[in-house]
Amino acid sequence: MTMLLDNPIWSALSGPHANLSMGDERARRYDPDFTSLAAVAPGADLSALDAIASLGTIGICTTSEPHIPVGWQVLEQFAVAQMVCDKLIDRELPSYVILADADVPEMTELVKLTRPGPFARRTREFGTFIGIRDQGRLVAMAGERMKIDGHDEVSAVCTHPDYQGRGYARGLV
């Protein structure tokens, strides 16, 4: 099971999210309306992404320093922590609502304000997104993005700055 997490984007795109992927047996990406994430199969070179990279900026995740193909430009590079929850902690859950398509404009505004990571026009369609509202206003949210056999990525975890420190993000996760 952990081997799937060694190349999580590929595992999702060639597994449970194959229906959302574009590409072939060497390289796949999500439709840019969902996210910019892309991956290559184990052992494949990043140049395998050339054909599908033309659809727009891509984001990759690697376990080692990648060899960047000639002509590519790195726009941003940062470390990512991958965590796995083996046991849920007993705690009182906050009162939350399930977010729907009608909530996307408000979700997008919260993401723009807090910058938890990529959130495209159709990201909400990856899975269930839940949120906390205060007097009708969306103040915190979290949702599912990549799905890998036995694992769901928790994504877009964010809380409006005026509501931070109340445990909303922890409760939603």
Language-model regions, residue ranges each:
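A short, internal acetyl-CoA/4′-phosphopantetheine-binding micro-motif in the GNAT/acyltransferase core
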Residues: 39-41, 102, 157-165
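Conserved acetyl-CoA-binding loop-helix of GNAT-fold acetyltransferases
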Residues: 46-50, 165-173
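Short, well-ordered beta-strand micro-motif
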Residues: 39, 82-85, 131-133
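Short amphipathic alpha-helix that is part of the acyltransferase structural core
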Residues: 2-3, 79, 86-117
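A conserved beta-strand-loop-helix scaffold within acyl/acetyltransferase catalytic domains
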Residues: 118-128, 132-161
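A glycine-rich, hydrophobic loop/mini-helix early in the fold
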Residues: 59-93
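N-terminal charged segments
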Residues: 1-67
